[in-house]
Regions:
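Nucleotide and nucleotide-moiety/phosphate-recognizing core
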Residues: 1-106, 111-127, 134-138, 144
Length: 145
């Protein structure tokens, strides 16, 4: 995939390791300090512009590791792939998982990131709807057309 000049592209190695392995690869490609904020978003979220509005609407707390959305259907749940995190907190959580399990390949994001001190923003299910099924795709196509 081509990306604009100045954009860093990262991919887990080997490919297909899951979202947490992708986050790990992305962090490794960045040259940022531990207190810098990193936005993590799922690639199958067509409504990402709206998601960012909720995540960045207010300053983040000094003592928190990040902010995530809480929404979904049929019951709301923490959306760890729709969040903004301190780079150091992400790195620490991933490094601890690697130390315990040898790798984050195939490991669930929730399993590793749920221990972080996160602020949560409650949103409707539509805000964080992703594309997992043909019905999801049809819903987004009707909404974006």
């Amino acid at each position: 995939m081509r990306v604009p000049s100045g954009v860093t592209r990262a991919l887990e190695d080997p490919p297909g390791g899951g979202p947490l392995a992708g986050i790990d690869a992305g962090l490794a490609a960045l040259s940022v300090g531990a207190d810098c904020w990193v936005i993590v978003v799922s690639v199958d979220c067509p409504g990402i512009a709206g998601v960012l509005r909720y995540l960045l609407a207010e300053p983040l707390g000094i003592a928190c590791d990040g902010r995530i959305l809480r929404g979904g259907d049929p019951e709301p749940f923490d959306q760890y792939l729709m969040g903004v995190y301190r780079a150091g907190a992400l790195r620490r959580a991933i490094d601890e998982a690697v130390a315990r399990h040898g790798s984050v390949r195939g490991m669930g994001v929730r399993r590793v990131l749920r221990a972080l001190a996160l602020e949560r923003v409650d949103v409707s299910a539509d805000v964080c709807r992703d594309v997992d099924t043909p019905e999801d795709l049809a819903w987004w196509e009707s909404r974006l057309s």
